[in-house]
C-alpha cells in the first residue's frame, strides 16, 4: 500500500467455520463485520451489487449504507461491496464479496409462526371481522392462499425498526410484516432485480418526466416532444381524444355510415370507434402541383410538367433551416422595459437580451411557424413537431415606428384607392425601407482581447526601441565612433542641465545645417568645434548676407566664450599658470581665428552665384540652396534680386522655382526700377522664353518703371515681333476673360 492511501476494508463473517461448508456459505443469523486498518475512516457498503457512492445521484435509489455495527444479510445470493473514506475525502478501493445466505432454524420457526398468523387473519377477513391488537384496528385485506413451500424464502421486515419505534409497536410491525410478506409473494419477479434495473424500469414507467433530460412532461396530452430538449416523449397510457361535442357525427370506416361520435361503438356494425378516432400523425397525403397549361397533376419533387414540360409555378413558403423554425412575425410593435436593467425589449420577448431576466408582464404562448402548434412561453422546442423555436429578431425602435407609420399610410392610401375606381394600366407599388447596418457592441471577451493585443504591441515596441547610452567617465575610443558620439551627446546633455548660463545661450539661436567640425587634440585636452548655419527668424528672412555673417560670428563668439570649467576665465586670472598652459591656449586661439577667416559663403551668395553669369542655373542646386535657408528675394551687389539676375543671364528654367518659393515676380529693382518682365522684353528675341514663363507666372504687363514705360513699350522699342505678338495675345486673352466675366454678371443681374 502506498503512503497516504486508505486501506481497503475487509468483509469478515463472525462465526466458527462449520465443517463441510465453504467460507462464503453462511446463514441469515451470522453477523458480518466490515472494518479497515486505516484509523479515523468511515465505511460505506451496499447489498445489491452496486458501487457505494458518497453522494446520492438524482433519480436513483439510495442503496448505500453506513456501517456502524455487524449486520445480518438477507436470504439468498448477496453481493456485498464496501469502501472506506477518510475524513479529508480520500477513498479506498472497492472490495466485493459474494455470500450465499441460507435461512437459519430460528428464521424457519418464525416463518411458520407468521404463516399461522396469516391463515388466522384470512379467516377473520372472510368472516368480515377486524383484527384488533393492543387497541389498534387494522383494515380487512384479502390475502391469497399460498403454500408454505413458495413463501419460505420471503424476505422479512426490518430487524432494527422495532427498537427505534419502541416496545409498543411490535404488534403493528407484526401485522405490517404479514402484509409485506404477502405483497412480496405476489411481486416475486421484482425481488431479484438490481438497483440499476429498478431505476431503468422506473425511468421507463415515469410518464410525468422526459426520459432524456428528466424535465416535466408537457401539460398538453397530445404533445409528442419535450419542450426543453426536443426528445420524443412516450404516449400517455390510455390516451383519449377530448370529448366530442353533442350532435357531432362521423363516418365509420367499416360500414361507411354516419354515426354519432359520442358512443364507444358503432350503432350499426358495433365496431369500436376509439381506434378510428386516434390521430394518424404518421400518414400524410402526397403533395401535387397542378399544371396551369394542361391541368395535369404532377408530383411535388419535380419542376416541369410530365405532360407538356412547362415549368410548374410553386407557392412561396417560408424557408426553414433543418430542424429550426423561424419566429412567427408579430403584428404588434409595442416595447416593454426590463424590470432589472431597464432594457427595452419586444412585448413578446421571453427573456431580456441584456441580463437574461424574464419579463415582468404576462407572456403568452409561443406558436410554431412550421406546424402551427402552441407551446409553453418558455419552451425551447415545439411539442408538436420537435423543431427548435428561434427567437424573434431584434429591431430598433425607430424602424418599428417607421414601419407603423408606413403601415398607417398604406392603409389610408388603400382606403382612398378602394373608393376611387381603378384606372386601366395603373401599376400599384409602394416604397419600403429597411435597415442594413446595425449597431455593434463588443463583448467583454473582445474588449479583453483588444487590451491584450495593445499591451503586447507596446511591449514589442519597447523592446525594439534603442536604449539610451549610459553616461560613462571615459569613452572607449579605438575606432568606435558610434560610442564616441553617444559619449559626446550624453556629456553635453549632462553639462547643459547642470550649467544654467550655457543652457540659456544654447537655447536662443535657430540652428540650420551643420557645415563643419574641427577636432584638436593634445596631451591634455580634446577640443571639438562644430559650426551650424544660423537660420534667421521669420520676420527677417529678407536680411542681407552681411547681417547673416555677423550673426554667425556673434554666435560663434557666444559659444566660444563658454567652455567647460572656464566660464569666467580672463587674462588676469591666469597670470600664475604654467608655460605649457599658456602655449596651449595660444594654439587654441590661433586655430579659432583661422576657422573664422575660412568660413564658407552664405547661402544667399551661393544662390546669386548660381543664377549669375558664372553659374549654370541648375534647378536641383537652386532647390537645395532654398531648402537650406537661402532667401529667394535676396539682392545682389547691384541691388537686383535673384529673379532678375536669372532673366538677365538666360537661366529661364529656375524662374518657376523662385516664384514658387515666394519670390515677387513684379519686384522693381535697378536704377530704372524695372521688373523681371521689363528686363526680359529689353532682351528681344533672346528673352522670348523668359517672357513666356513670366507671363505664365502672372507677371503684370501694365507695370511701369520710373520712366513710365510698360514691358510692352520696351518690347516695341526693342523691335521684337515675337515678343510683341506673345504679349498682345496674353493681353487680349485677359481682356476677353474680363469682358466675358462682365457679361455673365450682367446677364445674371438681368434674369434675377
Swiss-Prot record:
<dbReference type="GO" id="GO:0005737">
    <property type="term" value="C:cytoplasm"/>
</dbReference>
<dbReference type="InterPro" id="IPR002110">
    <property type="entry name" value="Ankyrin_rpt"/>
</dbReference>
<feature type="compositionally biased region" description="Basic and acidic residues">
    <location>
        <begin position="448"/>
        <end position="469"/>
    </location>
</feature>
<dbReference type="InterPro" id="IPR038587">
    <property type="entry name" value="Ribosomal_eL40_sf"/>
</dbReference>
<feature type="compositionally biased region" description="Polar residues">
    <location>
        <begin position="555"/>
        <end position="580"/>
    </location>
</feature>
<dbReference type="GO" id="GO:0042462">
    <property type="term" value="P:eye photoreceptor cell development"/>
</dbReference>
<dbReference type="Pfam" id="PF13290">
    <property type="entry name" value="CHB_HEX_C_1"/>
</dbReference>
<keyword id="KW-0963">Cytoplasm</keyword>
<dbReference type="Pfam" id="PF12773">
    <property type="entry name" value="DZR"/>
</dbReference>
<dbReference type="GO" id="GO:0005813">
    <property type="term" value="C:centrosome"/>
</dbReference>
<feature type="compositionally biased region" description="Basic and acidic residues">
    <location>
        <begin position="600"/>
        <end position="614"/>
    </location>
</feature>
<dbReference type="InterPro" id="IPR025874">
    <property type="entry name" value="DZR"/>
</dbReference>
<keyword id="KW-0206">Cytoskeleton</keyword>
<feature type="region of interest" description="Disordered">
    <location>
        <begin position="448"/>
        <end position="471"/>
    </location>
</feature>
<keyword id="KW-0597">Phosphoprotein</keyword>
<keyword id="KW-0863">Zinc-finger</keyword>
<dbReference type="Pfam" id="PF12796">
    <property type="entry name" value="Ank_2"/>
</dbReference>
<feature type="region of interest" description="Disordered">
    <location>
        <begin position="536"/>
        <end position="614"/>
    </location>
</feature>
<feature type="zinc finger region" description="DZANK-type 2">
    <location>
        <begin position="338"/>
        <end position="386"/>
    </location>
</feature>
<feature type="repeat" description="ANK 3">
    <location>
        <begin position="707"/>
        <end position="737"/>
    </location>
</feature>
<keyword id="KW-0966">Cell projection</keyword>
<dbReference type="GO" id="GO:0032386">
    <property type="term" value="P:regulation of intracellular transport"/>
</dbReference>
<dbReference type="GO" id="GO:0042995">
    <property type="term" value="C:cell projection"/>
</dbReference>
<keyword id="KW-0479">Metal-binding</keyword>
<protein>
    <recommendedName>
        <fullName>Double zinc ribbon and ankyrin repeat-containing protein 1</fullName>
    </recommendedName>
</protein>
<feature type="zinc finger region" description="DZANK-type 1">
    <location>
        <begin position="210"/>
        <end position="270"/>
    </location>
</feature>
<keyword id="KW-0862">Zinc</keyword>
<dbReference type="InterPro" id="IPR052481">
    <property type="entry name" value="DZAN1"/>
</dbReference>
<keyword id="KW-0040">ANK repeat</keyword>
<keyword id="KW-0677">Repeat</keyword>
<dbReference type="GO" id="GO:0008270">
    <property type="term" value="F:zinc ion binding"/>
</dbReference>
<dbReference type="InterPro" id="IPR036770">
    <property type="entry name" value="Ankyrin_rpt-contain_sf"/>
</dbReference>
<feature type="repeat" description="ANK 1">
    <location>
        <begin position="638"/>
        <end position="667"/>
    </location>
</feature>
<feature type="repeat" description="ANK 2">
    <location>
        <begin position="672"/>
        <end position="703"/>
    </location>
</feature>
<comment type="function">
    <text>Required for the intracellular transport of organelles and vesicles, and is essential for the photoreceptor's outer segments formation, maintenance and function.</text>
</comment>
<feature type="compositionally biased region" description="Low complexity">
    <location>
        <begin position="536"/>
        <end position="554"/>
    </location>
</feature>
